[in-house]
Amino acid sequence: AVAGDVELVAGVRSTLAHDWRAGARKRLPQLMTGLAARHTRHGDLAQTIEPDLKEAHGGLRDMTVLRALAAAWLTDRPHGEVDTAYEQLLDVRDALQVVTGRGRDRLGREDHDAVAALLGYADADDLLTMVSRSGRTVAYALDATARRAGQSQRARTLRVGPRRSALVALGYGVFEHDGEAVLGTTPAADPVLPLRVAVVAARAALPLAPATLANLAALPDLPDPWPSAARELFTDLLATGDGLPVMWAGLTQARLVHRW
């Protein structure tokens, strides 16, 4: 607390946290609906030239939701890169409000150069690159954590008889499992496999499970130049349409895109 009774603040905070945990599973669908509506209204921070640093997908408010999901004991949340990204977005908003003298959250074009200069970036392009990268990191962390929370909720649903999540074959050893694409077996040391798996999952509009991404990231790099099979698969991946963005986000966070 900035001022006031520390014990009172701690008591209120504890009561609110208890109430949130007690009702979080019932409130989760409503929370996700509101989240999707807000993202639709304000767009994707990583893809917007004049982003709303607070309300957009990948913005500051999404970090609040991320923390709330973890505080509800629905799932763990990632740390490290997402915390750094959040701090960078806070710095941008602070600089924006210093430059404009107002409590703004939208980074307008007219403020790009001044904010970049205040934060020590060479130009507005460097600033926007950082904002986009940070927004992408926060968005991916939130989306993955929200999926984990949904999976946790479904796992606790009472069922008659033993519960076993179905594996739906998608092809090439890839399966759909609880809303994600997973590999059915430990991958062989095939550097083309990440592209093959990405194409299958993107066509099904499914994100890759974190464990599968980690396994793919551990595979060796593609040779230079790429073999024809890899080039054809990469072309197929770019042509997968609406399923590509969620797939690309996972590949980026796993550093696979950087290695290509």
What do these predicted ranges mean?
Residues 1-260:
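A nucleotide- and high-energy phosphate-metabolite-utilizing enzyme signature
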